[in-house]
Curated annotation (Swiss-Prot):
Protein name as annotated: Peptide Ctri10033
Subcellular location, record wording: Secreted
Segment forming the signal sequence: 1-22
Additional free-text comment from the UniProt record: Shows a low ability to inhibit hepatitis C virus (HCV) infection in Huh7.5.1 cells and no ability to inhibit hepatitis B virus in HepG2.2.15 cells.
Tissue expression notes: Expressed by the venom gland.
UniProt keyword terms in alphabetical order: Amidation, Antimicrobial, Antiviral protein, Secreted, Signal
Organism in which the protein naturally occurs: Chaerilus tricostatus
Family: Belongs to the non-disulfide-bridged peptide (NDBP) superfamily. Short antimicrobial peptide (group 4) family.
Length: 75
């Protein structure tokens, strides 16, 4: 009696996992195609932000260098 229920349970598990796998295989490419443009926009914003920080640091170092060079005597 127990083996009959175990067999039915295993059949249901196999069927359920097959359906889930088919669902995931079908939906994941669509989700990737939907999410990819948003990730590119976020990455582009992040790159612009990092370029802006880099330029600010570069200007600050340039001003510090000018200040340092102005303290040296002229020869």
């Amino acid at each position: 009696m127990n083996s009959k229920y175990l067999f039915v349970f295993l059949i249901l598990i196999v069927t359920f996992t097959d359906l889930c796998q088919g669902f995931l295989v079908g939906i994941l490419p669509r989700m990737r195609g939907f999410i990819t443009p948003f990730l590119k926009k976020v990455r582009g914003r992040r790159e612009l932000g990092s370029q802006y920080d880099y330029l600010q640091d570069f200007r600050k170092r340039e001003l510090d260098l000018d200040d340092l060079l102005s303290k040296f005597p002229d020869y």
